[in-house]
Regions:
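Active-site catalytic loop in hydrolytic enzyme cores
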Residues: 135, 151-228, 237-250
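Short beta-strand segments enriched in small/hydrophobic residues
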Residues: 54-68
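Conserved small/polar residues in nucleotide/adenosyl-binding loops
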Residues: 1-5, 339-345
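Cys-nucleophile CN-hydrolase/nitrilase-fold catalytic domain and related Cys-dependent amidase chemistry
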Residues: 74, 78, 82-166, 171, ...
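CN hydrolase (nitrilase-like) catalytic-core segments centered on the catalytic cysteine
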Residues: 123-145, 213-305
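Cysteine/selenocysteine-centered motifs that mediate thiol-based redox chemistry or coordinate metal-sulfur cofactors
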Residues: 207-220, 319-341
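Terminal substrate-recognition subdomain of acyl/acetyltransferases
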Residues: 3-57
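Short hydrophobic/aromatic beta-strand or adjacent loop that forms the aromatic wall/cage
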Residues: 32-37, 158, 194, 276-279, ...
Length: 347
């Protein structure tokens, strides 16, 4: 009876049974020579590293709710970009997020071309835009998620963006699911690369707009240890925005991570297929006692150009994974585990 009480106490305090051992104590007749090997995970343990400073646990994110306006040159565009980078970095932010297709005003230069040719003209700026962002990341000591822009590769056109780290390195991410309009009007192809990114303060993922509406993508990144998911988006109407926003909140709950979204506002009367935009950028959290009850950490004013700065506490995620009211990550069955379910037959 005493041993049963001890085991009950241990299991109620998050010890986990790793295996049952036989012939552990041959002389212990009461236990029939059985023993349980238990494990307790110390979520606060930090392994020794060669880093001089400890890893950050509170990360500051900055969002740009971008106003679409006419820019005649790439220099005009980056005058506005640098203004926002300067402003957000002034608040000691670790990240700044720009929206999807923030550089669309430059397509006005190609108004004499068809929509599919105009977007390819815009793709001609992508390498220079990436390089300029990288210089800003270094100069202002901030990690930049560049939203998204078109990229031509091997005869196909993709919707991509870049993580420009403040240490001078960069990596690319791709939009996996392109919208029907992107396919019809611009001839875009869906990408195939999905990964998480290590940074100096968090492991992050990026999903471009429509991709956040497919839970499998963020689930893969959550399995890779993603702590913050960034979602640059471009939506024209409030119902389109609601799809992105509601799905973003769902991703925060089911993957026990922070989700940061940023979009564009205003209109571009001189750019085909980019008439109007609607956005309300925000930072979303899981829903548990340590987080806002509605899962909204911070939100921008709808349809107004502004920046939004918010802190997110990574330690809260670690505690949630183990001690949360519910534990979506630990309790989620892998896809193969659902093969036993009885599904209705179709005739």
């Amino acid at each position: 009876m005493y041993k049963r009480q001890v085991l009950t106490f241990q299991l109620s305090n998050d010890f986990h049974v790793r295996k049952v051992m036989t012939n552990y104590l041959p002389n212990d007749e009461e236990s029939k020579h059985y023993a349980c090997l238990l494990q307790w995970d110390n979520i606060y343990y930090q392994p020794e590293t060669s880093e001089t400073l400890p890893a950050k646990t509170t990360v500051r994110v900055g969002l740009v709710q971008w106003q679409m306006r006419g820019y005649r040159t790439i220099d005009d565009l980056f005058e506005q970009i640098e203004f926002f980078v300067d402003a957000v970095s002034g608040y000691k932010s670790d990240f700044i997020l720009f929206p999807e297709y923030f550089n669309a005003p430059l397509m006005a230069e190609f108004n004499n071309l068809s929509e599919s040719q105009a977007i390819r003209g815009l793709a001609g700026y992508t390498d220079e835009i990436r390089d300029r962002f990288l210089q800003l990341a270094i100069s202002y000591n901030i990690n930049i998620i560049t939203g998204s822009m078109p990229l031509q590769r091997d005869g196909n056109l993709y919707n991509v963006g870049f993580l420009c780290r403040r240490d001078g390195s960069y990596e690319m991410y791709e939009k996996i699911h392109v919208t029907p309009d992107e396919t019809k009007s611009w001839g875009l192809s869906g990408g195939s690369m999905l990964k998480t990114f290590d940074t100096d303060c968090a492991k992050i993922g990026v999903l471009i707009c429509y991709d956040v509406e497919f839970p499998e993508l963020s689930r893969i990144m959550a399995d890779q240890g993603m702590q913050i998911l960034f979602v640059p988006y471009l939506t024209d109407t409030q119902n389109a925005y609601s799809r992105v926003r509601v799905c973003a909140q769902a991703r925060a709950i089911e993957n026990e991570c922070f989700v940061v979204i940023a979009g564009s506002v205003g209109n571009l009367p001189r750019v085909h297929n980019m008439d109007i935009q609607y956005a309300q950028s925000g930072v979303f959290t899981p829903c548990d006692f340590a987080f806002p009850t509605d899962g909204r950490r911070a939100e921008a004013t709808p349809n107004t150009e502004m920046i939004l700065v918010s802190d997110v506490d990574l330690d809260l995620l670690s505690e949630l994974h183990t001690y949360g009211g519910v534990r979506n990550l630990k309790d989620r069955r892998r896809a193969v585990s659902y093969t036993h379910l009885t599904l209705p037959t179709t005739e």
